[in-house]
Amino acid sequence: MYRKYKCVSCASEELIGKTLELAGWVSSIRDHGGVKFLDLRDDSGIMQVVAREDQLTHISKESSVHVIGTLRKRDPELINPKIQTGHYEIAASSISVLGKCDLLPFEVDDSRNVKEELRLKYRFLDLRNPINSKIIKLRSEILHFLRNKMYDLGFTEVQTPILTASSPEGARDYLVPSRKYKGKFYALPQAPQIFKQILMVSGFDKYFQIAPCFRDEDSRADRAPGEFYQLDFEMAFAHQEDIFKIGEEILYSLFSKFGSNKKITPPPFPRISYKEAMEKYGSDKPDLRNKLVIVDLSDIFLGSGFAAFDGKTVKSIMVPNCSSRPRRFFDKMNEFAQSIGMQGLGYIKFDENMNPSGPINKFIPDDRRQKFLDITNAQPNCSVFFISDMKPFAQKYAGEIRTKLANELGLIKNDTFEFCYITDFNMYEKDEDGKVIFTHNPFSMPQGGLDALLNSDPLDILAYQYDIVCNGIELSSGAVRNHEPETLIKAFEIAGYSKDEVISKFPSLYNALRFGAPPHAGMAPGFDRMLMLLTDSTNIREVVAFPLNSNAQDVLLGAPNDVSEQQLREIHIKIRN
């Protein structure tokens, strides 16, 4: 063995004066009054090593080394209270190089300030940075915690296939050509949707897995290109509320244990309908740490003669203690409004005596002024901002203005995890061509069941679909599944699919549902997104050991890469120019 102790575990009073063997990487080399100091780093921490100059000849930073020496207390002036081992040091009798390090492309301790492309190319160096390695170790701890939690809740872990059939719904698939069956393809699963539903039909009451999911879609700060992981679970004989309670139990316990003592929404989490979320927050992913609320003033300006507002949807946001802000603040908000597509951002300011001023004040009809004050809940020293457009745009713009105001005014505190469920999504919507399509998951049960599908306007039908949102980030989506074959066929027919098409596209699911399928429901909290929140990471790639870059490239291994003509022939593929 190269070592019997790690840097932190050897920092003990009982070991003082004993000869120890350590191994790790050279984090730094310093000269202090003619004495050489080497900081030895392993995955537990750092230990200071005192060495002679001749022992450090030809040793470079980040080389891996083997150290033999005696543990002793540091001199008082050399104590470092910032690290666990700060009272101890090793007096080296021998230092040998195990692996020499070439010229470094960047300093490991400063790697988080290096361009991402370089960090990913030398990810093996980037991960030596204790901040980065700590995140990956935390990922392992959380995986362990979640598995134990699911076992404690009575769930059975089942791995579903990675090579499966392509699905016509959802995002773009990653396709894998078959060598054996010319012209046919496997697909990497976007989610274990069909398999987990079939497990419920198979008699499993509670299923879960930490499921890898593959989607060929563009990246965002909170969405990794290529692959991601989710805590996928499903329950048989379950209502929506049964799933909500399990989701609350999992997330509350997880964030209580790993959430750095931040405040957490206690169960039951607020239930907010999609309609209410769009009306009050302008988003179906509301950040409830932001206490600003959107209200509707369309009736106030109806028939007012003010062309910019009359006949349109008018939204407003009352911001307390904002009227004394300098003119530059209001100009900046107006510039932001224009940058997102608005004509401009009107406002009224109220002083301490509730005297109004601002460009919109004169357009409020006198006989509706009190109603305006009541609806907006205007108060001394507040400002009221106005957003006007056609309804979908007005809601969207109001949501963006609400977020911008909170960020500019420092209204969002980072000491809280605010959870909520978003419920009652529309089952259908119209696309740009006016065609009725599914809004979200096509396998969801419509509220009202088959009767609603037969007798209601499709655009009025709500689905048993739900999201979990935390601090403005969608952590999970889920649904009560449509387990009735007749209802499933009708749901797809409304979206333009014939019965034959449904059966041909989803033969295994349709066939399984014909054999006594139980009512079932589930959800799948995004594992990477949960880790982002728990580590205060702004980019999902920070919580993945070997992520693709934002262009879906693995710059470490060079994927996607060219393959030989022979490999292409074996899988019956020809590349077109």
Regions found by a protein language model. Give the residues of each.
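Class II aminoacyl-tRNA synthetase catalytic cores and aaRS-like
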Residues: M1-N577
